[in-house]
């Protein structure tokens, strides 16, 4: 697999949430409306220079306090790979923008910043129907890119492009004119010799419009640790169960959210007693978490021993209270306990709900980071009625959990005789819980299970049908997490006895 084939898996495709020509529109109809307005521009192909300018605008504007101030002149870009995705040609019965999407070129850029000596990579495109900037990992190495999170994006990339192709081919002249009318864009088209309508606008550049990077996590925790340090994220779990079980993605995500808020917290007595019996490192510690020493460095490897011990102890406690099912290749947790766990620690939250960009944006603006999860397995449940099998429900399991802690928006202004068409793409910043690897900005639309952001059952058989590494089903979030000091009594305890025969 080429570097691009691997990393293209990490891209998210666009959401057009700023377009509002229909009230209460679904995400899919909003995307379709934006494609109709884009058809009215008469042009959809950007030059590579314009595409790189969009990427540069994103990189310089989305800087956070955790990074040094970034200058546009500090970046150097290298085209690492490119690929073209082809689709069957479709004859469209419309005079406005009659071309179907036959092929799309995607580009993988590596970049470095000489001022802060950081390096990262990005997925881009020169086709505005897909988007100029698709994913940005500000600090990351392609060689470190092989993890489960990328496998999910590979499938989403294929299917999201297919969804875009279908939507583009579906719109007709009448729909384009209607959308333009609602957007208060007049359609005074010219007729060429081939009777093709041309509604030409001056295409603008994609630039960073707004975002909120004030809630970014200051931790880059993981499920074990690749460093040489004696105490790793899963050391306390290993001390209790005598096997190198991973902490689990939900455990790591929730631990990082707690480290962001730094609530007053004492280890749950049952967990502290169990840990004291098995691990001498906690001897003399009263179970009170000292967030200052736990977060002095983003990585556990560079903390003091006391800080390392408390981070490892926190991972053990959360895993236990989530009812973790431990494993050396992966540790799962009961997602039904997410909300109650936060409540028991004095945090109000809205529990698991369906993903939407507006929920993410509002939650970050009002409170801070939120939890996201995607399921990897779908199980249909049936009953027999008069000998005939009938589906009665569907359940989801497996997958991955991560933190969303920022959002950002890119916009493009297209003009014609004073009229303006504005296109918009929304991004969310994900801390995926692998020690900073692949933390970055991804297009929000891929998470929306109501529109394109899913792996179709008809296609997942290629690679991902009910495979644990893929979490294409039922992406949900726990929004509005915030400390209110109201501790709801929940009877947790050591929740799962590890299976020694796994």
Label every PLM stretch briefly.
Residues 94-118, 348-426:
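Active-site-adjacent substructure of cysteine-protease-like catalytic cores
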Residues 1-8:
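Sec-dependent N-terminal signal peptides
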Residues 12-15:
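C-terminal motif of bacterial Sec signal peptides marking the signal peptidase cleavage site
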Residues 125-141, 405-406, 410-444:
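Catalytic Cys-His active-site segments of thiol-dependent hydrolases/isopeptidases
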Residues 434-502:
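A recurrent domain-boundary module in secreted/ectodomain proteins
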Residues 19-68, 247, 251-354:
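Cysteine-nucleophile protease catalytic domains, especially the papain-like/related folds used
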